């Protein structure tokens, strides 16, 4: 078991190394639009999950995924050269869906805000259906009379 702080530092270093390797070390045009967003390392430092996003349409995303899978060995070699640990962790690349989920959440919040504005506009001219308090009467009830 490694110290969680050490695992965090290692994950940050792997993130930088993978990003640099994608930019300089890999001679594949398919991986140009790839951005590394996060790296998570297991507690035993043997496995690293690299999350990435791709700017572009579905064809670009699919091509980038294939490019990353084809160059996984080169990326691991570059990470191994940049780290000073005995065993280089295996790298697993996962497409990050957080930006799409955030965009969807923003759309839902925008729709809710528009609906709230519509309801507020409808509420402006509205009035109560009856008196202010339909249960209040002018004469006191027998139950409300003071006891002697």
Swiss-Prot record:
The keyword Transferase is annotated on this UniProt entry: no
Pfam families linked to this entry: RBFA
Entries under SUPFAM superfamilies matching the protein: Ribosome-binding factor A, RbfA
Localization terms from the record: Cytoplasm
Keywords, sorted A to Z: Cytoplasm, Ribosome biogenesis
InterPro entries from the UniProt entry: KH_dom-like_a/b, RbfA, RbfA_dom_sf, Ribosome-bd_factorA_CS
GO terms for cellular component: cytosol
Region (Disordered) residue spans: 120-148
Ranges of compositional bias, category Basic and acidic residues: 133-148
One MF term in the entry's GO annotations: ribosomal small subunit binding
GO BP terms in the entry: maturation of SSU-rRNA
Membrane spanning residue stretches: none
Quaternary structure annotation from Swiss-Prot or TrEMBL: Monomer. Binds 30S ribosomal subunits, but not 50S ribosomal subunits or 70S ribosomes.
Known function: One of several proteins that assist in the late maturation steps of the functional core of the 30S ribosomal subunit. Associates with free 30S ribosomal subunits (but not with 30S subunits that are part of 70S ribosomes or polysomes). Required for efficient processing of 16S rRNA. May interact with the 5'-terminal helix region of 16S rRNA.
Family, as annotated: Belongs to the RbfA family.
The protein, known as: Ribosome-binding factor A
Biological classification of the source: Bacteria, Bacillati, Actinomycetota, Actinomycetes, Micrococcales
